[in-house]
Amino acid sequence: MAKQIEFNDAARKSLEAGVDRLANAVKVTLGPRGRNVVLDKKWGAPTITNDGVTIAREIELDDPYENLGAQLAKEVATKTNDVAGDGTTTATVLAQALVKEGLRNVAAGAAPSALKHGIEVSVEAIAGRLLENTREVAGGQVASVAAISAQSPEIGELLAEAFDKVGKDGVITIEESSSMVTELVLTEGMQFDKGYLSPHFVTDHERQEAVLEDALILINQGKISSIQEFLPLLEKTLKASKPLFIIAEDVDGEALSTLIVNRLRGNLNVVAVKAPGFGDRRKAMLQDIAILTGAQVVSPEIGLSLDQVGLEVLGTARRITVTKDNTTIVDGAGTDADVADRVSQLRAELERTDSDWDKEKLQERLAKLAGGIGVIKVGAATEVELKEKKHRIEDAVSSTRAALEEGIVAGGGSALVQAAKALDENAEVKALEGDAVTAVNLVRRAVAQPLRWIAENAGHDGYLVISKVAELPDGHGFNAATGEYGDLIAQGVIDPVKVTRSALRNAASIAALVLTTEALVVEKPEEDESDSHAGHQH
């Protein structure tokens, strides 16, 4: 396949244009007065959202060079979403500002490598200051963090209640409700850190997860490689017309191939995952899952082999969600008495053990068995509203978890503007020379852009707001919802510091790559067959 190459300024301008087009679509959603973006879907109703990463994922540009820039900006949003679960719009706006300011300096003759070094040192200084300004989350602030992310005080209260019930490490899942009411339901369930063995098992491609409703559960202690030993049970499962969830030491070879083929042909909705843990701990965790789901572990140790067992060894659960990293089982069919017995047994083991490591692992297993799962059932009048609301609640869950992990800073873009004061005080920043000093001022201007767009989207003069906020004490800033200045933390306008730091670092990482790019290589578009025969007489 022939390639096209673009060099120097032309290459960097194309990247900038691509970053701009994506960022301009995303930044209109920033802040409490941000607008929505409507995404066309090939089938079904369009999606209305204000979630940066959801918008970014949909964008592909015609121009192959510009598209490279858009994909880099998309990477900023995706990476921030993976680490912090929110802050994707802020990250995109920061990346756009750093790229724009940086390329202006490169065009004026600044050395890209010096700018890159200056950006990295400056960003670390600001990230460090953000950590210094962090406050721990107090009781009522959980609702504030969630409410800001979801743009709804009611959802904020609901999530505060959910985290209160399941704890900061507890599992919260989001489901669609058949009614118009959004409610919290506490249920028995478990999550463990193993994902699907093949992406072919995915049922929801937008969210890259496999969801099984009312599924049968096979728990096998050993490997499943041969289809022969597995076939009798597979045929019985097919007759039961229910989805099948398999947990085993591993599933590979022809067994995995057969499952994938049946899944792709639509014969059987199936997902396979590796068993969590190692050695004796793995056996114990499989037994925990078996008790929770009413299954029996298939193991030669107790005289059971795959080719001899029937549906009676399978457990069931109302819903199982599997991502590439995690599995969540909700409402297993195990009896309350069996689960309570297992919990008592684990507590007794916990009291007997002296090993810190064993204690930690037993605590984890206890939390999984006894902690339960908070299920938020999302209700809305239409399917379009339901999807939009679900996106907001997902963001809010991630944001709240991030706040509970690392603490909070003032929201509304103010924390970044005030943390930029570190650029005047940090020893490493002061030691910079030449074009690296230019990068310091470039970063100072760039970190003010989220505040600018939050203000502009609310109908205020962004640059005027920036100059006022820069003079206010830490923790004070501009509340775009009311249009007033004040103590943002007291007013509940707060952001998780993890979200703000991740957004800044990821934006700087991509901006540094763009500034030091000298050539772009893309595939040459194929000529249309009808064009190549144009003018020929037949």
Swiss-Prot record:
Keyword Transmembrane: no
Location within or outside the cell: Cytoplasm
UniProt keyword list: ATP-binding, Chaperone, Cytoplasm, Isomerase, Nucleotide-binding
EC supergroup of this enzyme: isomerase
Source species, domain of life: Bacteria
Any one GO molecular function term: ATP binding
Broad class of the protein's primary localization: cytoplasm
Residues the record lists as binding ATP: T29, L30, G31, P32, D86, G87, T88, T89, T90, G412, N479, A480, A481, D495
One Pfam family named in its UniProt record: Cpn60_TCP1
A GO BP entry: protein refolding
Catalytic activity as recorded in UniProt: ATP + H2O + a folded polypeptide = ADP + phosphate + an unfolded polypeptide
E.C. numbers: 5.6.1.7
GO CC, any one term: cytoplasm
Disulfide bonds: none
Protein family per UniProt: Belongs to the chaperonin (HSP60) family.
Function recorded in the entry: Together with its co-chaperonin GroES, plays an essential role in assisting protein folding. The GroEL-GroES system forms a nano-cage that allows encapsulation of the non-native substrate proteins and provides a physical environment optimized to promote and accelerate protein folding.
Quaternary structure and interacting proteins, as annotated: Forms a cylinder of 14 subunits composed of two heptameric rings stacked back-to-back. Interacts with the co-chaperonin GroES.
Official protein name in the record: Chaperonin GroEL 2
Organism per entry: Renibacterium salmoninarum (strain ATCC 33209 / DSM 20767 / JCM 11484 / NBRC 15589 / NCIMB 2235)
Organism classification: Bacteria, Bacillati, Actinomycetota, Actinomycetes, Micrococcales
Gene name linked to the record: groEL2
